[in-house]
Structure formats: C-alpha cells, structure tokens
Amino acid sequence: FVGMIAGGMRIAGQLGGNEKVQLLSGLFIATLPNAVIQASNTESSNIVAFWILAMASLFLDWLKARDRENICKLGCCIGFAILSKGSAYVTAFPFVLAIAFFCLRSPRKLLLQGIAAAAIIIALNAPHLARTYQAYGSIVGGTERNILYHPTPGTLAVNIVYNFLLHEPWLLKGPLLGFWQGLPAALGVDVNDKTIFPWRGLEEYEAQFQVVDTVTQNIIQAILLLAMPVSIILRKFKTPWTYSSLVGATFLLYWIFLTWHPWAGRIHTSMFVLAAPLAGLYINSWPKKWLQKTFVIILLASTFLVFQGGLRRLSIFDSNERNFLYNTRNYLYFNNYKHFDQDYINAVNFLASQHPKSIGLEIYDDSFEYPLWAFMADSVREMPRILHITSQKDRDTLKPEFILALPQGTPELPLAKPHILERKNGEYVKVFPVTEDAASSDKNQQ
C-alpha cells in the first residue's frame, strides 16, 4: 500500500508535477477505498497494482534513457504483475505494445532490449503457465468466465456504464435502476447471455455503500476520473499525451475484453492508481484554490467512513470485535465465519505437526483457503510445497504427502470444514478431522 502511494507520487514527478501535484497523487491513492480495504486482507489487488505502478514508472525512465538496465527492471515488473493476478495481462498490455513499438522503430539499438524484457517476463511466468495448462488445458486456467470473447460496440457501452455504476450505488435507486437495467436490451445486448454476464446483471448488485473485501466503491475518485476526459475534450485540462493515452488504453481494453460482475470493483484498483498521477495534475489545474482544498477535505473525510464499516474497522473509540486495533489479523480473517476459525486452526496445527514437504490443495471455485497459508507460515520453519490438485490424475502424478480438501459448502454454510488426506501405501486416507471410529482403531493398533 505504501509502495503504491510512493509509486504514484514518483510518476507524478516524472510527468512534470511539482511537490503539490505529487502529494495530491499520493493522497488520491492513500484515500482510495478499494486500496485501503485491500491493504488489510489477503487479496492480490494491491500487489498487482504496485507492480503495475512500478512498471509505468520504469517505462517513463526507459523512454527517456532507452537503456538496458531499465528495460530489464521493466520486464521484471511486468512479469511479477502477471504472476500476481491475471488482470495484469490487460492492464500491462498497452505498455507492452508501446515498448514493442519503440523497439521495432529502432531495431538496431533497442530490439535486443525488447527481447531481453520478453525473456524475463516469460521466465518468471513459465512454471506457473505450464502448471496451469497441465491442470486446465489452457494457460488462462479457470478464468474463462472473466473473458469476453465476442465484444461488440454494445457490450463496450454497457461495460463502461456498468463498471462506473459499481462505484456509484446512489445512481441505482428508484426509477434510475430500471433505466440502467433496460440499457443492455436497448443496445442489443442480452443480459441473460452467460458469455457476457456470467454472474447476471445489476439485479445481483446491492445498491448501497459497502465496505467489504469484494465490494468497496471508490465514489469520489470515480467521479473525478469521469470529469477528467470531459475537461480534456472541453480543453480545460492539458494532459501528458503519452502517459494518459496508455492509461486510457488500459481502461478501454478492460471494458472491451473482460466481463462484468458485481465484485469487479476490486479489480479496478490497478487502473485507478495508474490514473492517480493524472488526477493530481488535474486537481492542481483547477483555477479556484478553495475548490482544491475542499476536494482534499472530502477525500480525507471519506476515508474515515471506510474505516467505520465493513469487516475490519479502525477507531480508537470502537472496541468492536471487527476493529483491527484490538484484534489480531488471524482473528479478523473469520469475521464473517466465526464458527469455522477453530476448524482451520486445528487443520493447520495437524499439518504442521506432520512436517510435510508437499501438500496438495483440492478446492472448489470459491474456497476460502487464504487463512490456511497465513497460519501455516506462522507454524512451520519452512513452508511446504503447495500443489493444486484438480483430478485423480494429478493425485497419481504429483503424489503430495498430504491433500488438504476444501469441498463446496451449502447456501446456509458456504464454507465447508477442511479435510486432510494422507498418502499411505499408494492411496489417500482421511486423517483429519479424526472420526470416533478412526480414533478407536488407532488406540486398538497401539
């Protein structure tokens, strides 16, 4: 989170912004509700956003120097961004395209640099891509529902509007909701088409300000980003052409190729922080200083609202069990699932006592496996190798010592209790949780 703020401020300086612009850019990120919430959980949105910002900053350095050191660092940042989250393919692509353009325009001087950067990106991701292809038969893994394979002007328009509405729930009240729900049909887009809306449309989105891991709205920042292109069109704001074009292309590619879903807002973090330096320049361009100061106060005040709700609260006056000033991170993992925390802790304690070298992970589409690895890191000297198991063939081929299974729960209890299987005599036998019959059998053997 701190790295994102520093990265945004550095880019603002690279774009010619003074100290005030840099501070405004940092403030834009520091008060971004999505980023604040993601900074205190196990999601990877902030991680990929940091690498994307580092990539953008190094791109500007390389654009000026055209040197090998910066292009190699640039390749590392792109590689780590992609390794952190698949959405980085879209976010980084305009910058990759720009690098390729400049390298091909001066092949004698820059082509080898471009090849070196590409080699670094591939080397960092090759093991993961190979394993993903082995498990799913595709390098995109199980993310097919996130990709819009047949985009049209209609799907683009709907995606732009619906993604903006994710951050402005107040626009989904009363008759406005019916208007937005009717927009896809008016543009020739079938809201029941699962290739376009794999998780249905706006009826699945709760139209209220929320502070949770999957849904947190950037209300103020989204309005500011909408105002920027309007000001550019009206010639009220002159923006750095190269950087703003790349940021705009990132937003455009996202709207064209990624499907909409109610919790897509958390994926927007990378794009919001990329736009932060431009936001700093934009706020600084306002002729009325009182308006700038008022906007800064609004940003700061909105942050307090973020800390007062949701799963993890921050207030010296609030001793609520969700307040992370008074509770450990491990405790806060289970704010929504208090009846499961001990099951996870017991499973980790059991695995740690066995000192495994490898653990197979069998999960369904949306399993809650994050706490397991956080707990495990605190319980063992050396983390075991984690292997994703998707079939019996994987079990036979990879042969992990233990398999940690997180089956799908029920609508009433969405999380199922973890089960652990141990490989014995070539077969996997359930060893946790210990049943009464198994415990009795062990005693008899002893």
Residue ranges and their predicted role:
Residues 37-47:
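Short acidic/glycine- and proline-prone juxtamembrane loop motifs at membrane-interface regions
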Residues 45-49, 81, 90, 137, ...:
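Hydrophobic/aromatic-rich transmembrane helices and adjacent perimembrane loops
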Residues 300-350, 365-368:
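Membrane-proximal, lumen/periplasm-facing interface regions of secretory-pathway glyco-
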